[in-house]
Amino acid sequence: QGEASACWRLTVRVLEAWRLHRVDLLSEADPYVILQLPTSPGMKFRTKTVSNSSHPVWNETFSFLIQSRVKNVLELGIYDEDLITKDDICFKVFYDISEVLPGKLLQKTFFLGPQGQEELDVEFLVEETPGPPEYLITNNVLVARELSRLDVHLDRAGSTPGGADWGKLELELVLKGSFEDTQTSALGTASAFRFHYLAAQDTELHGRLKSSRSSGWNTDSSAGHFTVPLQSLAGGREVTICVPATDDPGVRLQLKADSCPKELDVRLGFDLCVEEQAFLSRRKQVVAMALKQALQLDRDLQEEEVPVVGIMAEGGGARAMTSLCGHLLALQKLGLLDCVTYLSGISGATWAMAHLYGDPEWSQKDLQGPISHIRKHMAKSKLRAFSPQSLASYWHKLQLRASQGHPTTAVDLWALLLEFSLHGQVADQTLSGQRDALERGQNPLPLYLSLNVKEDTVDTLHFKEWVEFTPYEVGFLKYGAFVPPELFGSEFFMGRLMRRLPESPICFLEAIWSNIFSLNLMDTWYNLAWSGEEWKQHVKEEIHSTEEPEDCLRTSLWTEASWLQPGTALARAFKGVLTGRPLCHHGANFLHGLQLHQGYSGQKDFSTWADCQSDSTPSQLTPQQPQLCLVDAGYLINNSYPSMFRPGRRLDLILYFGYSLSSHFEALQQAELYCRTQGLHFPHVEISAEDRCQPRECYLFADPTCPEAPVLLYFPLVNVSFKDHSTPGVWRSPEELWAGQVDLNKTTTPYFLLNMTYSEEDFDHLLQLNDYNLQNSQDTILQALRMALKHRAPEARPQGAQ
């Protein structure tokens, strides 16, 4: 959605502060104020320092060019200058500029501390600016603004290379707030530079010639400083400037600014992409035929009558991979695999999915083939993965990856180890290559899920964002922003592709989806110490806290509450130890530079997935970060419910495969709580005390009073009748009873999370157990399919549903 919107001039006058407490023991504070507006990139101002004062008076004025359609939150930080150690930050204030009415001077007093003793007085004025409006593209949560491109050409005509000692001179250009920020080049090499920056950016290009020697930089020998205001380049004018140099005054720069294309390379929208919608139409033809045969229907189903069935597989390392193979094999034997439209998973379940989709016809072939491949590599010793030859191969591949521009981390090494362990070699298959498996609707659409978290400041419970991967696109559910998988990992700015990198082989994505090495100490503490009830209470409180700021934003009360008084350096260091992730994934952020819409927090599409306090502070959200930090989605809830409940998919039946060894209903009930708290329709899950002690093989959950809620079939990992039956209805002979003894005891099982090597016998037992449990529930599955058929019927759907 495109729109035109004018820019405004924000003037901020920092007046004075009152009753500032001392930070140093021997003297009063030496305060100064730093002002920053993230939506005006590159603009950062600082007042003068007032020495030894608890009542500093600054009376200084600063100016920002702002766009009224985005969320402009000014950050004012009060610092205490220290000549010996790092300056201490005393207070930080976040102020929503939308409270300032255009043309009316507003004086604001900020109460800084929790007791409100310290105060800061500031004046604000917003005025209209001349000039054409800015063209914006928005989905009402994110906003892409106009970009300009600055080309700089170094002209050395008339200069004498020998006389200027060219080998020791470098040209450094700095454009704060641009994608490139700083570029440096020796005068004897490249002579062209390019910067991408906000068209409505009120900043300057800074440059200098400086001397570079083999021993390092010599800042004292810097020469040729110059500044070019970007406004002087408006209208596509070409400007030539002379750059004074130490020995050669003849160096000139030719500068020209042009508009960047308005089209985006990031898709902004919450609807399903057109490729997925086309797939659904193709897949419904396959599903309709399979349902007609399975349910013995006497007529063909029309497209709008075909129910949408999805599989939701829990994580659990090799246990999840093996178990999912057993479940899919059983569905194939029952002739029900073609009834499934979506196949979603996290963590270890994605290993099975990624392997299967390497064959475009996998669900139309006997699954015993790919399962035998997995069995072979699961049973082999993994010591070869650590042989000198293998390690040398990993090193070569990581070097190649780095040379392509990808940042390499320990997660990439995990990817290579994982691929070698599971398949004996590193294949070149990609996520986008899985489209071949969807072109005729011959397989379900795979949905892979991950979490984006903070790298070193917050634990997973207090900041997490769902990131979905499909063969068609990768994106954030909360922001409604997606890119094709070919471009995931490439560098973006303001929705435009800046630098394209080769698509990563899927093993590197598998390592992200199952990245169990990014737990910080706080995550570990919550996992060990929190009970289920404490987790539920936290979810309710955290989500409730995201609902409060929207009301508060309409008044000045929110601004007074949005102060931050950071702790001491020791406290910050201790927090860093607790929340740091030493082995996390680093990747380019395709949301980088995009800004939040003025009314983003009130949008239903955003609030559906908003579940942490940071959601009310734009500068804390992902568009402001240069990199992503993706981890295993099982860190929060061990299932892929966000993919199943994404608006637009409207599932009628979910087959939920649980792979936990002990807490069989925990992730299921966590998903129910989360969905209900977020306003998503989830069938009511009620588990009796008897079932908690001795779970059954299959549960059916439905809510007839809520037509929006899908029917849900839950299959926990249990060994009930399989102990006595080789196949449904066939009792084991005394000689066969050993084959039904599958050890699922948490303390003695061979299927513990970190075990990557199963004996062939253990692999077969786990595979056959899941195969049997699902086949033994055939009648319940058929009942659920009939309910789904009824659920999809036009008279059963709420108005407006599809």
Q: Which residue stretches match the model-derived regions?
A:
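Low-complexity, highly charged intrinsically disordered N-terminal segments
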Residues: A245-L301
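C-terminal, well-structured subdomains that either form a transmembrane helix-short loop-helix hairpin
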Residues: P307-A318, T322, G326, S619-Q669
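Calcium-regulated, polybasic anionic-phospholipid
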Residues: W8-S53, D82, L150-L187, R213-S215
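C2-type phospholipid-binding modules
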Residues: R19-E28, N52-S53, V57, R69-V143, ...
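Catalytic or ion-translocation cores adjacent to nucleophile or general acid/base/metal-coordination motifs
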Residues: L328-S390, Y641-R646, R650-E690
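Patatin-like phospholipase A catalytic core
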Residues: L336, D359-P360, L367-L630, G634-R650, ...
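Helix-rich "cap/lid" substructures immediately adjacent to catalytic or cofactor-binding pockets
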Residues: A290-V340, I374, M378
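Exposed aromatic-hydrophobic patches
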Residues: P56-Q67, A186-A199, N589-L591
